[in-house]
Regions:
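WD40/WD-repeat beta-propeller blade N-cap
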Residues: 23-30, 36-37, 94-101, 142-166, ...
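Residue-level recognition of a conserved intra-blade site in WD40 beta-propeller repeats
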Residues: 35, 60, 106, 110-111, ...
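C-terminal interaction modules of eukaryotic adaptor/scaffold proteins
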Residues: 157-206
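Structural hallmark of WD40 beta-propellers
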Residues: 1, 19, 40-46, 51-68, ...
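WD40-repeat beta-propellers
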Residues: 6-13, 33, 76-81, 104, ...
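Conserved strand-to-loop turn within each blade of WD40 beta-propeller repeats
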Residues: 1-4, 29, 69-74, 119-123, ...
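Short loop/turn segments immediately following beta-strands, especially the blade-tip
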Residues: 11-15, 40, 80-87, 130-141, ...
Length: 206
């Protein structure tokens, strides 16, 4: 029998009370969650269609309720809030890691044309998940430290692998720079170049 650990969502209500939504999350456990930006990618810079006569103009910045969770089942799950049922539902499952997913970070999207989610794993990899439109599939890309980082000791890790467990990932406020914290005591900064390739632009030792 598979045991699922629960996700708890707390919201502040108008009557001054905390409301709790509880739902099944990941088998074994959940290590991290990250909220999606409150607006869709590109909605602030994309011209919106004009409303027909007699209709209300829809807001280009309507609120989005969505988050990602990182699990001990090696999966990343995308959750969305359904207004019709007033409940949270699993929208998508992202498969790519072979060990516990330690962290997940959804990038801020102001000015960005697509969604970016970074995940860090016990399997020594960092995956960048991109989604071009709300209906497009998620596409994953692995960061490759072997092309830019010298090993601290011993043999270099294989392509696509960091030297140790990757514990944390964090985006800059602009959403175009990713910090990666590895178990070997190094923090690296990564940026996507004009060709769509992720490059290490800074390397710091603790």
């Amino acid at each position: 029998m598979t045991t699922f650990l629960y996700l708890f969502y707390l919201s502040w209500s108008d009557d001054g009370q905390w409301d709790a939504d509880i739902f099944n999350g990941h088998a074994i456990g959940c290590n991290a969650v990250s909220w999606a930006p409150a607006i869709l990618p590109g909605s602030l810079i994309t011209p919106q269609p004009q409303a027909a006569p007699g209709q209300t103009q829809s807001s280009p910045t309507s609120s989005v309720k969505r988050f990602a969770s990182a699990g001990c089942d090696n999966l990343v799950k995308i959750w969305g809030y359904r207004e019709d049922s007033q409940s949270w539902a699993e929208e998508e499952t992202l498969e790519g890691h072979t060990d516990w997913v330690r962290d997940v970070a959804w990038a801020p999207n102001v000015g960005l044309p697509r969604s970016y989610v970074a995940t860090a794993s016990q399997d020594k990899t960092v995956l960048i998940w991109t989604k071009d439109t709300p209906t497009a599939p998620w596409v994953k890309t692995a960061l490759d430290p072997s092309t830019s980082l010298a090993p601290t000791s011993g043999a270099p890790p294989p392509p696509g692998k960091f030297p140790d467990v990757v514990w944390r990932v964090s985006w800059s406020l602009a959403g175009n720079l990713l910090a990666v914290s590895c178990g070997d005591g190094r923090v690296t900064l990564w940026k996507e170049n004009l060709k769509g390739v992720w490059e290490c632009v800074s390397d710091m030792n603790s």
